[in-house]
Curated annotation (Swiss-Prot):
Disruption phenotype: Reduced total acylsugar levels, with abnormal accumulation of di-acylsucrose, S2:17 (5,12), and two triacylsucroses, S3:19 (2,5,12) and S3:22 (5,5,12) lacking furanose ring acylation, but impaired accumulation of S3:15 (5,5,5), S4:17 (2,5,5,5) and S4:24 (2,5,5,12) acylsucroses.
Any one Pfam family match given in the protein's UniProt record, by short name: Transferase
Name of encoding gene: ASAT3
Official protein name in the record: Acylsugar acyltransferase 3
Tissue and organ expression note: Expressed in tip cells of type I trichomes of stems and petioles, sites of acylsugars production.
Gene Ontology terms describing biological process: sucrose metabolic process
Amino acid sequence: MASSTIISRKMIKLLSPTPSSLRCHKLSFMDHINFPLHSPYAFFYPKIPQNYSNKISQVLENSLSKVLSFYYPLAGKINNNYTYVDCNDTGAEYLNVRIDCPMSQILNHPYNDVVDVVFPQDLPWSSSSLTRSPLVVQLSHFDCGGVAVSACTSHTIFDGYCLSKFINDWASTARNMEFKPSPQFNASTFFPLPSETNLSSTLPATRPSQRHVSRMYNFSSSNLTRLKDIVTKESHVKNPTRVEVASALVHKCGVTMSMESSGMFKPTLMSHAMNLRPPIPLNTMGNATCIILTTAMTEDEVKLPNFVAKLQKDKQQLRDKLKDMKEDRMPLYTLELGKNAMNIIEKDTHDVYLCSGMTNTGLHKIDFGWGEPVRVTLATHPNKNNFIFMDEQSGDGLNVLITLTKDDMLKFQSNKELLEFASPVVESTK
């Protein structure tokens, strides 16, 4: 297993100080009810042009300093009861690290867990929002000359959509220091904290981190088309999305895996995160997601056409419900859905699968000036049965980061139906 050595650690200050009128950033109810974790993303660049080889860190630091002036809550401090951020311009934590192996050793490994070395130790998915900077960046240098750029952002301030906007704006600034981002930290105007609510009771309990294993699988565009054809020919489903058909397949493989272990079928619950932008404006920064809950109570409902039909129905029902809902009601409804899911998890009546998506965000093309990454990934998730969908590096396919227990992964990765439509992702960086 590769190890890392910290070369330097510093705080990146804002290029322009935050105006006193923006010093107190009110958190929204959506922010408040999220798990206070650091979400970890990493971008791998194996070949650095010679004109950048000696100034990568300088480019990242200078551009980060400027972009933080627009994303100022990331350089502040979250208060103890998660109601506001003191935008005191403390800065973002920035580490320079040396990795004692070539990048190919990481990217060609069958399991994704080895990428954890490019993240600050013990930070990914941890509840460190009060003790660490809301943004922690690590630049990792490999023996081969390649680099990885990782960013861990506090989920209290950002959801995945906002993280993608920030990374894209940071990269645009790195390429052109005249670029001006336009984020709006106004989520609390749409989702205000209700004054009558006992805030401490809405805070989610943090769960101890557990070690699982992750593998990334690729669904090529042609295989996604095959899956869509299967679904549409055997049902009344129209225009299934690539995430819907891929979700249905990994869900079915999960059910097969579970039945191999227990010898019987167990009902399932799958959750998908849905972005609320729109109707919320696209440049609204903060947490603005709701969850879609889909169940399969029988083996027949697990079949691809049937499960995709249920996914689409549940998605449309949620859209219809939210369409007529006042914005200040949305957080309470989201909290209600979350509590329903937690009750099912605690009762252990269903196998639960958690899905989130970072598709159509441009993260697979993040270019700080030295080209696009060959791999975008996350640190190993603490929750088992977790599926994260991302755009593949080229084309219209999907990459899916799958986290399971070690024993379950051994069964899952040998599933013939999975391997008919998806393949493990490994890269050659030579």
